[in-house]
Swiss-Prot record:
Gene label: HBB
Protein name as it appears in the record: Hemoglobin subunit beta
Naturally occurring in which organism (per UniProt): Chrysocyon brachyurus (Maned wolf)
Keyword field contains Ion transport: no
Globin domain mapped to chain residues: 2-146
Function: Involved in oxygen transport from the lung to the various peripheral tissues.
Matching InterPro entries: Globin, Globin-like_sf, Globin/Proto, Hemoglobin_b, Hemoglobin_oxygen_transport
Entry similarity comment: Belongs to the globin family.
Length: 146
């Protein structure tokens, strides 16, 4: 992903304020609610029958935190996203058989959640930078599929 120095600054500046536990769970929860077919990858998570059940599910929150911690690793390695996510790409492709389109969906949901949490601070410039990053991460996660 090619980001300008200003875009990198915008991304890292906002990311330093992100509560990974809260935002991760909310992003994954919203993915599972807005795109319910993604729930099939989370059969072991228990009750996902209603939006309230999804958003209060401890396993959704825990996995969302794990996802965002991996995303944080990506932010530290923007010049080598494919390398950073190589093992996760392999896992999601070969073992879990996740449709790579879901990575794009989750990235877009994450952008929505960040906008919700940061309001006016999430300017169009910040959004544009984050859209580049989530697209790059989704592409890196889909790399094993190519």
């Amino acid at each position: 992903v090619h980001l300008t120095a200003e875009e990198k600054s915008l991304v890292s500046g906002l990311w330093g304020k992100v509560n990974v536990d809260e935002v991760g769970g909310e992003a994954l929860g919203r993915l599972l609610i807005v795109y319910p077919w993604t729930q099939r990858f989370f059969d072991s998570f228990g009750d996902l029958s209603t939006p309230d059940a999804v958003m209060s599910n401890a396993k959704v929150k825990a996995h969302g935190k794990k996802v965002l911690n991996s995303f944080s690793d990506g932010l530290k390695n923007l010049d080598n996203l494919k390398g950073t996510f190589a093992k996760l790409s392999e896992l999601h492709c070969d073992k879990l058989h996740v449709d790579p389109e879901n990575f794009k969906l989750l990235g877009n949901v994450l952008v929505c959640v960040l906008a919700h949490h940061f309001g006016k601070e999430f300017t169009p410039q910040v959004q544009a930078a984050y859209q580049k990053v989530v697209a790059g991460v989704a592409n890196a996660l889909a790399h094993k599929y190519h």
